[in-house]
């Protein structure tokens, strides 16, 4: 599938705090649409984005630009899974295919808090897609992202074919002492990497959660957080690993189930909320879940550990 005139959709949003509530302003161009915002228990602005075109084809570009002012809190998600259709061999003009691109840029002011939680990306056979996430945050800001990608429609017996998925992530702290890198991540999945035991080993789902905490975590606090996150893997299928960042944590999922990836990441999300002494998260109303991923014991266990919270 190839459009003669590819989309270049943009979404630019600014968030500002007023007392205990965060407000947003800005706008989008087609095919983006903003849905109705909700207020979380902590005054957070919870905002779903709709991609009205139904999917991306080669040449399409999506750009999301988010700016959070001092003390503001926001949660951004998507209304549905994003689809990227095959590009290779679909056009006589570009028989080798053209790349679809999605870029997300975030700037977080002092004491701000952003949760970037889009629904999964489904990459069809022979699709070419690049994603980038660039985050600049103040020393005392918090940023959490969880992104899941399914390579091929496995329910239809399809794999990625000749397609390719690329991802670039960079997180930088901007403070009085200059800039320091929190995380730099470059990934490419295609060809042999999909089947090699050091790649996806034949599985179709890959996910990454990153939490950049608002303050350094003590060793006992971080050890407890990682131990609890590993315990949260119980009952879920796939390979799940988590480790520390300089000021936060990173978790990876490789397996057959986007549902299990989302469940595990949701449980870690709940733990990061408790660590910040915030209200327990509310699953976004647009997520099509038939089960509750946040088990009750998640919050019971966290009550004790939250006494060691650093922020």
From Swiss-Prot:
Top-level lineage group: Bacteria
The residues the entry assigns to the signal sequence are none
Its principal location?
A: cytoplasm
Pfam families per the record? UreD
Q: Name one GO molecular function term.
A: nickel cation binding
Q: Which UniProt keywords apply?
A: Chaperone, Cytoplasm, Nickel insertion
Q: Where does this polypeptide localize?
A: Cytoplasm
Task of the protein: Required for maturation of urease via the functional incorporation of the urease nickel metallocenter.
Write out the similarity annotation.
Answer: Belongs to the UreD family.
Describe its assembly. Answer: UreD, UreF and UreG form a complex that acts as a GTP-hydrolysis-dependent molecular chaperone, activating the urease apoprotein by helping to assemble the nickel containing metallocenter of UreC. The UreE protein probably delivers the nickel.
State what protein this is by name: Urease accessory protein UreD
Organism, per UniProt? Answer: Synechococcus sp. (strain CC9902)
Q: What is the lineage of its organism?
A: Bacteria, Bacillati, Cyanobacteriota, Cyanophyceae, Synechococcales
Q: What gene makes this protein? A: ureD
